[in-house]
């Protein structure tokens, strides 16, 4: 479980909170097995060392209830096609398990719950013939009292606008990645950005730098990192490197699981935007997500080059297209990586389909990465639409003068020139003034 995932008790104050004694499910999930055994012995669970970890947590909570305690649980609602739902834990994978909490169709209708809602409530343990915990009483929805969200708008009815507030990525003088992006490919709240990345060009490190810049400069932004079809060690590294919430579906899981995780993360982000919040989703990668959709989409009989079904890209485009700045308040920013030069014709077709859908492109170059220059950022090819709204007239003029100078250089010379000058200055303002003097 990601330690930085928000919980009801630690991150938000809820007016309707009922005092609850004992241990909470989300707390037990973070404890090492040794501590769980210690708690079990304290509660006088019989033979605790014979239980598997998940079963031991179950026994602790069941014993706690029989001794007069309550269970308070915070989870993300996943609504099934039959109308009922489950609260999934913040373990980063929304995996099915006996610790999930059942939510009845009547509760979903009564409180107008939606997919991706973060629900906090009192939970009872399973009875003899039941497999799951059951939600008894809802305390809060999306960290707010339930009566406050009854009139919340629907995400699809909100008005999209061009991004008009820049997300500052510059956070340390020596970390030039964020500084370069702030000038040459600025990211605003509500941006739909594509990181175009050949293999081994440092896209994972770039994602970490983006996450660090966002969390350092914008504490009001809720950061979500979504890793699809990634290696397990990459997931662990990301969880330990960034402060945002990391959700993942690793390459050893089926395509259906990739899609389920991605869609639940998107629904969760939409629910927060409906509440007027600013949310940033870093997706690695849109290519692998599109591959997963292609694997599960029934054949339409129309196959594009590379084996991509004509209908397979509609849903990943809908995912990417959800990014928008909202006129009524709030924003959803999606920064996704797109893989190129992998040797796969399918990946090239997917990239071509997504190339025109974003309003910002961050291009990484293999020839720059081969020179061991990081970030392998192709300044000349990268850019943001309507960047005049984000940068302002004065800064935009200076950036365009600098771009005109660099047009006479190749991509490696341009990056080396900017990199060396940024190393001599403490921030972008000083860098632009230095360039202006020349």
From Swiss-Prot:
SMART domains xref list: AAA, CSP, Rho_N
Annotated positions binding ATP: 188-193, 200-205, 231
EC number: 3.6.4.-
Alphabetized GO MF terms: ATP binding; ATP hydrolysis activity; ATP-dependent activity, acting on RNA; helicase activity; RNA binding
Keyword Oxidoreductase appears in the UniProt entry: no
PROSITE patterns per UniProt: RHO_RNA_BD
Residue span, Rho RNA-BD domain: 70-145
GO biological process: DNA-templated transcription termination
Keywords attached to this entry: ATP-binding, Helicase, Hydrolase, Nucleotide-binding, RNA-binding, Transcription, Transcription regulation, Transcription termination
UniProt-listed InterPro entries: AAA+_ATPase, ATPase_F1/V1/A1_a/bsu_nucl-bd, CSD, NA-bd_OB-fold, P-loop_NTPase, Rho-like_N, Rho_factor_ATP-bd, Rho_N_sf
Family annotation (HAMAP family): Rho
The family this protein is said to belong to: Belongs to the Rho family.
Subunit composition and interactions: Homohexamer. The homohexamer assembles into an open ring structure.
Function of the molecule: Facilitates transcription termination by a mechanism that involves Rho binding to the nascent RNA, activation of Rho's RNA-dependent ATPase activity, and release of the mRNA from the DNA template.
Entry protein name: Transcription termination factor Rho
Species this protein is from: Helicobacter pylori (strain ATCC 700392 / 26695) (Campylobacter pylori)
High-level lineage: Bacteria, Pseudomonadati, Campylobacterota, Epsilonproteobacteria, Campylobacterales
